[in-house]
């Protein structure tokens, strides 16, 4: 009696979990790339490798947006509990903003080409590592 609906419901839940895991993995990957971009920029300026990494961040951000839209569609069409739906969507939106901030900072480096005094390089690298570590902590704590 409940076999088909239950299997479908649990199947959708597993798929939703996989999509959210993919999203969190992308957030983590973008953070790791960003952690590498800052010292690369500070040491080499706007090198080809730097441009490639900025492009990589942009591609991952686009992929994360697609996953977010798919999760949103699934939640609205197939989730039975509206309160849980809004909580998950809000968390995803906030984490997507973090990816957007990473991307925005990469573009700022790429377009504006700021020149940081050498004495600040170590602190900027340390700050970027701390930011990435904080994002990692937040993303795995909330989902």
Predicted feature locations:
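Hydrophobic/aromatic-rich structural module bridging two neighboring secondary-structure elements via a short loop
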Residues: 56-60, 68-99
């Amino acid at each position: 009696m409940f076999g088909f609906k239950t299997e479908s419901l649990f199947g959708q839940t597993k798929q939703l979990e996989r999509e959210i895991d993919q999203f969190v993995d992308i957030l983590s990957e973008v953070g790791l790339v960003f952690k590498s971009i800052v010292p690369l920029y500070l040491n080499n300026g706007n090198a080809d490798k730097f441009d490639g990494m900025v492009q990589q961040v942009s591609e991952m951000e686009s992929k994360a947006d697609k996953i977010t839209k798919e999760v949103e569609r699934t939640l609205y069409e197939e989730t039975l509990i509206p309160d849980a739906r809004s909580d998950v969507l809000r968390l995803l939106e906030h984490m997507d903003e973090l990816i957007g901030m990473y991307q925005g900072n990469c573009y700022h480096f790429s377009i504006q080409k700021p020149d940081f005094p050498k004495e600040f390089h170590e602190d900027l690298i340390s700050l970027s590592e701390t930011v990435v570590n904080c994002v990692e902590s937040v993303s795995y704590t909330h989902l």
